[in-house]
Amino acid sequence: LIFGGTGLLGSAAAQIFIDRGHHVKTIALPPLPEGAPIPKEMEIEFGNFLELSDEQLEAAMTGMDAFVYAAGVDERVEFPAPVYDAYKKYNIDPVDRCLAMAKKCGVKRCVVLGSYFSWLAKTHPEMDLCAKHPYIRSRIDQEKVAAKYADENMGVGVLELPYIFGTQPGRRPVWVILIEQLQRFEKLPFTMYPAGGTAMLTVRQVGECIVGAAEQVQGFRAYGISCYNMHWREFLKIVYRAMDGIQDRKIVDVPKWTFQAFGLHMRKEYAKRNVQSGIDPVGLADIMGMDLFIPTDDTKELGCTPDDIEAAIF
């Protein structure tokens, strides 16, 4: 059973489950994205899983071996303050309720799609990220909630997902925001960007990680997910080749204070719109300026196979 089975990541996982001989069911909101590669073998029930009664949720979970929570919201979705409440509503409370029901129904393994910000917060406690960023605190809290249901009878895995590339027809790609950022430099002979880098992988590789965890997780595991670790400079050159056919765009490292100054401007912009950002734009400078590189051991353990990241970025 996948909640979020018609989304970008859920449908990629569904296809791999089906290819491996598993039966897959999802509860999804209509309409299906037009032209999206949603496996025809997947059983789709239309509805909002957040609004299911206990009886309906129990009926959906009964007889299932595995449950995947590929739903919820990420830091790009805007909410008024306090933004943590929205994350609790969409990311934490449903995981709490669904995993409790999964346990009651004898589901053997559960997989929750989390964030690489959790990996970062745990790896660098000195950065105090949970205090600065409501979104990161919510993802750590989501992991804690998921962990309490894991035991010898039900394995629970949280995938700490980084940047993911690959698109689904009918949906806005993840990196539209990045393109909007880069358009600010159109008139300049160079692009200014922080000096750090990030972990990343393709949509198909996320699907493989989901299926791998659903087939093998024991007890509780938070998996740090990465297949490629790339500096922003290298990544942006790929984006420019894809976007404008520019072979070797000049990228200039932005000092942290410049990014922080831009963050102060963004704080004011959010305040004007009555939005609280889940990632504080001033504190983001610390994250963007570092090499947020995650070892690839966990993805290898989950059975992730190589893919063409450059083609996926396009």
Q: What is each model feature region?
A:
Residues M42-D93:
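NAD(P)H-binding glycine-rich loop region in Rossmannoid oxidoreductase-like domains
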Residues W232, L236-M290:
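Terminal hydrophobic/aromatic helix or amphipathic segment near a protein terminus
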Residues L1-R20:
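N-terminal Rossmann NAD(P)H-binding glycine-rich loop of SDR-like oxidoreductase domains
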Residues V145-G170:
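Conserved beta-loop-beta element that borders a ligand/cofactor-binding pocket
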Residues G289-F314:
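Amphipathic terminal alpha-helices
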Residues G166-I179, A213-Y223, I246:
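Glycine/proline-rich active-site loop of Rossmann-fold NAD(P)-dependent oxidoreductases
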Residues D93-S138:
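Conserved Rossmann-fold NAD(P)-dependent oxidoreductase catalytic core, especially the SDR/UDP-sugar
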Residues E180-L201:
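A conserved pocket-lining segment of Rossmann-fold NAD(P)-dependent short-chain dehydrogenase/reductase
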